[in-house]
Amino acid sequence: MNLNPFWSMSTNTGRKRSDGEEQSGEQQQQQRASPARPSFGKKQLPSIPKNALPITKPASPAATAQLANGTHASYGPFYLEYSLLAEFTLVIKQKLPGIYVQPSYKSALMWFGVIFIRHGLYQDGVFKFTVYIPDNYPDGECPRVVFDIPVFHPLVDPVSGELDVRRAFTKWRRNHNHIWQVLMYARTVFYKINTMEPLNPEAAVLYDKDVQLFKSKVVDSVKLCNSHLFDQPKMDDPYAISFSSWNPAIHDDAKERMFTHKRRPEDHHKGLQVSGLSWVKPGSTQPFSKDDNPPQN
């Protein structure tokens, strides 16, 4: 039986001899020649179970740990990165109106965003925010949304600026809930006011009992947020969202291209073919207008 060196100590060094037992001269000579061993008294090592593995150092819990979703811990960082990449792809595909979001350069668990409110009580409001994603996503709690400047709103904490997201996502369910839904909820709260269990009781009371004063407070809040729109980002991150004043030398040309952009003729013909209208003459919507006989050279 091969044993780990940790277990290779002989169990006979402490064996109790009979009173009349004497060692031979040869054994005494061997003992003098060999280095002295530490005395273990009369104690013996416990017997080794048949299938036991030697323990040479404390076992690391992370070595055998598994994530809640069954993924081995060693794959955790890669699984998290893939999940966040998939979530950001979903955000792009949803084309959320009035919302722009950008992951942080330093951490994929932090996203910078801005919401543009185009009508309603918060019209013309431009609210910058940060999304904080749990490090065990998607098996943890709901991502948090914190506004850079606290907005006067029943569901926004007047001190920290955090939006009450958990009322909409009481329990985060992986593969069912997505970050784009959190972003959409952050936009919806400015169009549909909910005063139940508010984080800002003052805003809730004014909305229910004195809507005119509530509107006045909202206007002041919007002006405050917009007045800090061109401030430098609070975080030192190259991907943090920042605004700059209109610069005609830079922005006029980009604006002109946006308004005068036209599809190229080849793109137009390609679109007709892809749509299955091969029997329609390019530039026409009349059925069967395409000439079946190609021109002869």
UniProtKB/Swiss-Prot annotation:
Functional note: May function to promote vesicle trafficking and/or fusion. May also regulate apoptosis.
Subcellular location: Cytoplasm; Cell membrane
PROSITE patterns: UBC_2
Entry keyword Cytoplasm: yes
Superkingdom of this protein's organism: Eukaryota
SMART domains to which the protein is assigned, alphabetical: UBCc
Primary gene name: aktip
Family, as annotated: Belongs to the ubiquitin-conjugating enzyme family. FTS subfamily.
Coiled-coil stretches noted in the UniProt entry, renumbered to this chain: none
Keyword Membrane applies: yes
This protein's name: AKT-interacting protein
Pfam families in UniProt: UQ_con
InterPro entries: Ub_conjugating_enzyme, UBQ-conjugat_E2_core, UBQ-conjugating_enzyme/RWD
Alphabetically ordered keywords of this record: Apoptosis, Cell membrane, Cytoplasm, Membrane, Protein transport, Transport
Species of origin: Salmo salar (Atlantic salmon)
